[in-house]
């Protein structure tokens, strides 16, 4: 290994963060998460056709190539640790099914170059890169980012449809059949967020392997559900609709951009849930998961500062030394 990619501490060389001990190395964790993400990726291609595959490939390959180029320009070691591939794949799963490939490339390049590498690379980024890329695309291409198609509409003249969270969404059928379609994925939306079932299965796998903290998705989803009840909304609808499932299980649980303690993660998830509710209920956009998580990413250092447990032997600055107290 090159020393410029390591932090030297005495005689010990420590790799860059995240320093998470789960019995797996960081690359192994990344590749397990990547393998789990193949579940919603496969569902995306099944529901939305071949163009969804091009979106996934374009975003993932761009992320890897951009990270490779930047690392080489900075004369730092490039590692195929899987983090760039995860960023590219997650970004792709949050995009509309007809997103032009060139826009996908721009968003993926932004996610890696600006949201990740500009901060120093893996372990140093403040914001979730995939969500930062999605937010960038939403600002630059707002019309294209809100064009949705029902699964199966693969023809060139397919008509756009509203997502369930949109006020213009009209469902012809019973509430139970709507829940069923939202649970299995037969609704309009981003290519990787429509099937709650697939995302829940993926989340359970990660929790069972102890690769993510169960507190974040459970508290996040629970906050949205409880808040919906308080606001007089349909809790089941609010939980199944939009990007809540993919955000709770795969975005908010990011090691680097979420707090390090259980209490901190609980506060983080609660805040994300409340912000999601506020944006959905009072904001100009029907969906609030992306910006809710990004806002809480910004609060992560503050949460860690005040929630992180004090080390053994900690003494307040204002405290007097023991010998001084004895002499007084």
Task: Give the residues covered by each predicted segment.
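Structural signature of hydrophobic alpha-helical transmembrane segments
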Residues: 49-61, 98-107, 182, 186-196, ...
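C-terminal ends of transmembrane helices
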Residues: 65-76, 112-124, 199-209, 249-258
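Long hydrophobic alpha-helical segments that form multi-pass transmembrane helix bundles
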Residues: 124-200
């Amino acid at each position: 290994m090159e020393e410029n990619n390591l932090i030297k501490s005495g005689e010990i060389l420590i790799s860059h963060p995240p320093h998470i001990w789960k019995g797996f190395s960081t690359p192994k964790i990344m590749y397990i998460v990547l393998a789990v993400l193949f579940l919603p990726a496969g569902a995306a291609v099944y529901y939305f056709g071949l163009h969804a595959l091009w979106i996934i490939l374009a975003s993932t390959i761009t992320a890897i190539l951009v990270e490779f180029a930047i690392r080489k320009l900075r004369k730092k070691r490039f590692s195929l640790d899987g983090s760039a591939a995860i960023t590219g794949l997650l970004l792709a799963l949050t995009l509309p099914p007809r997103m032009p490939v060139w826009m996908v490339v721009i968003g993926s390049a932004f996610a890696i170059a600006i949201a990740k590498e500009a901060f120093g690379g893996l372990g140093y980024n403040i914001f979730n890169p995939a969500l930062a890329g999605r937010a960038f695309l939403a600002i630059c291409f707002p019309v294209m980012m809100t064009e949705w198609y029902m699964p199966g509409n693969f023809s060139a003249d397919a008509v756009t449809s509203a997502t369930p969270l949109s006020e213009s969404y009209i469902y012809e059928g019973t509430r139970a059949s709507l829940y069923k379609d939202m649970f299995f994925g037969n609704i309009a939306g981003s290519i990787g967020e429509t099937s709650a079932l697939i995302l829940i299965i993926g989340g359970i796998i990660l929790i069972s392997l102890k690769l993510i903290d169960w507190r974040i998705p459970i508290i996040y989803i629970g906050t949205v559900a409880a808040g919906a009840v308080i606001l007089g909304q349909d809790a089941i609808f609010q939980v199944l609709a939009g990007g809540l499932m993919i955000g709770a299980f795969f975005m908010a649980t990011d090691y680097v951009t979420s707090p390090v303690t259980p209490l901190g993660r609980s506060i983080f998830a609660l805040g994300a849930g409340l912000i999601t509710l506020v944006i959905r209920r009072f904001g100009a956009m029907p969906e609030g998961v992306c910006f809710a998580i990004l806002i809480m990413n910004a609060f992560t250092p503050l949460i860690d500062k005040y929630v992180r447990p004090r080390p053994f032997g900690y003494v307040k600055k204002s405290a007097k030394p023991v010998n001084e107290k004895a002499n007084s």
